[in-house]
Amino acid sequence: MKKLKFNVTGMSCAACQAHVEKAVSKVNGVMDVNVNLLANKMTVDLDEDVTNAQAVINAVESAGYGANEIGDKENKTASPVAAAQDESKKMKKRLWWSVGFLIPLFYICMGHMANIPIPPIFTGHKNMMIYALTQLLFTVPIIAINFHYFSNGFKNLIHRSPNMDSLIALGAAASFIYSVYGTYRMAYFMGRGDLGSAHEYMMNLYYESCGMILTLITVGKYLEARSKGKTADAVNKLVSLAPKTAVIIRDSEEVEVPAENVMVGDVFLLKAGWSVPCDGVLIDGNCTVDQSALTGESIPVDKAVGDRVMSASVSAGGFAKVRCEKQAKDSTLSQIIALVEDASASKAPVARLADKISAVFVPIVITIALISLVVWLLLGYSFAFALNMAISVLVISCPCSLGLATPTAIMVGTGKAAQFGILIKSAESLETAHSIDTVVLDKTGTCTEGKPELISAQAFGDFDVSELKKLCGSAESGSSHPLAKAVTGHCKTNGIELSPAESYTETAGGGISAVVEGRNVLIGNKRLMDNSGVDVSAAEKTAHAHADNGEIPLYVAIDNKFAGILFIADKIKETSAEAIEGFKKAGIETVMLTGDNEKTARAIQKKLGISQVRSQLMPEDKATIIKELQEQGKKVAMIGDGINDAPALTTADVGIAIGAGQDIAIESADIVLMKSDLNDAVTAVKLSRSVMKNIKENLFWALIYNSLGIPLAAGVFYGLLGWKLNPMFGAAAMSLSSVCVVTNALRLNLFKSSRENKAAKAEINTKTEDGKMKKVMKIDGMMCSHCTGTVTKVLNAIDGVTADVSLEDKCAYITLDKNVADEVLSKAVTDAGYKVKGIK
């Protein structure tokens, strides 16, 4: 099966979307089709052995629309709002020309109602034909300017797939044709001297209704096009980050080339203020990089030789040479844009109701309009009255508002998430996340830093600690397990010389064994020792005491004799407790899974306030526990690293990969967090809830609008309350309904992440009685009084800042007389050669 993408032209409403989907789904070999009205794009899953792209294009064209395949070579960083901007410009031009002809038309038709003097040539019985023909002359250009409504509308009627343009075309055409008919009847009666009958027809001309309907629809389309452009602002900002050029080293010379021409293996320069053109690795120099646009992290990150940099990051200082690892078209930025656009173009399950309604909406509206016409004629009302009712039904009905209700909110929501470094892969994932009531957390790398350290060691029997560390470090040197790295890292840091290890064996969920200097070394948990017949009872009291403090005990046996115990701790992330509290406030239960012993797990549970904990688990147990929770009726999200937790992430209702960095294409995850901050998972769930609330609001008002508007236009309330809707007001209402839906979706841009809300609260709480604000900046790299003096100087040089720097605390205590962004404070200190760890 292959996934193909197409641009689709000619769609104007949800009915168009439904017709295209229906036509393509009938093609033999098409497995799935998804059409996005907002983006004018279509995604098709097809069997290449049965069909091809041309067959899909033919199906779209046979339905009355146009399509072309989006090739792999198309620029992935092309602006997603370009089409909306072009559409907006075209609509604006049509609008001004339409208004130019509508104003004199209304002046002639309605001027007398506003007591505006009208030239005598347009008044009186003798001038009735001049009055009518002048209206005709001003209406024809408006029809010509907006003729696409008629061409598209009637073409789709012929193809038996009527859409919103069909409703507009029928309503405007009916007004115009009846008015032309009335003009001819006026001429007929005036030629026979029957001025009374001619006057009666003159009073029932609808030229101004025809002109006003078309102009008001164009007003709505113009505003809608502008709003559509704004829904993709987040992606457009990402696109604008990509630098146009890069400076590469070629034949020992600096050469400026287009960014897309930087090839894998090329070496490019990175200076202060320059943007990174593509993903790469530093091979010389060092720099400080601002990755905020990609990850949402405001503090610049120091990069040294061997470190990776991401495309569209900005160098905040330093000089470096970087080797290109991925071209611009395959870079992290391009992947982010592709993910966000794919998510925006996907369809949420909540949209199915709107799709079903849209598929039959226009035929039903046309039927209601015809019924309205016939009923009012049967009730004895004039043809002009009945026609007025039918036209009102046609022009007030709005399938657009239904079609835009979901995709606008999805596009804004996924774009907003990307600004926070949260990548949501599909609309379905976004919808599912809003109903999550249980979050399962992997301990290592999610709740903790994922970088265990050897804290202490205790030898037993005839063994000493130095010997214990050397043998353990040597045995673990062949393992890539985080606990093994903690042991070998400690040995390296403390200059402990290691020996080669032989016969290395790893027991999943237990530990390792190896032969070092002819001695059998066994390292692992108590279960491994018990299974190997090693008695560790002498160390159990000590092990429990350390485990109560969150440390992991690793038992060591040498030549099948208990030799000692290593204590390893994985530091809890600073933001983990805050994130767990955030989940609690959102009504979400938290469950931590770990392979550690129960004592260690309980200690971490207590520190973080986690609801439940499952310990001493094998890797395959995580997916089983998630299934158990799902069987209890819970909606489960799993948060892990996306590699070791792949089965669990796939099993969960929503899989969230944390700390992905450049590796954002994790297939097992539905949501990818660029940073290792658990708060972003809280933000993802809260954003999902906001998006779903917005979608439901949009669908509710779209359905209510049509449910009330159509009966009102048909005259249901005329007999009871005397309410009668003029077609012009119906057209205005239809135009505004779509604009209101899009505008409501744009409110999601006001959503704030957990980090932003925390910062806002901190800002309020740090204000002193005199209105000044206080902040504390943690700084690395200060070694002496000269350092503190330098930091004090650069901070005090900023307008509105008074700083007191403490060498002992490694902090700057800042008082602000006015609002100064954290980024400004950080940059000043970073440029001075120091590292900012955080600002509170």
Name these PLM-found stretches.
Residues 138-149, 173, 209-239, 345-441, ...:
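Hydrophobic alpha-helical transmembrane segments
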Residues 18, 353, 436, 516-518, ...:
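Conserved ATP-binding TGD loop and adjacent catalytic N/P-domain core of P-type ATPases
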Residues 73, 79, 186-190, 195-197, ...:
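Juxtamembrane coupling segments of multi-pass membrane pumps/enzymes
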Residues 1-132, 142, 252-254, 334, ...:
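Flexible metal-binding regulatory segments at protein termini and peripheral loops
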Residues 28-47, 54, 205-207, 236-330, ...:
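Conserved cytosolic catalytic loops of P-type ATPases
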Residues 93, 313, 437-480, 510-591, ...:
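ATP-driven catalytic headpiece of P-type ATPases
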Residues 114-130, 158, 177, 416, ...:
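Membrane-embedded alpha-helical bundles of multi-pass transporters
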Residues 90-245, 356, 457, 722-727, ...:
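Transmembrane helix-loop-helix hairpins at the membrane interface
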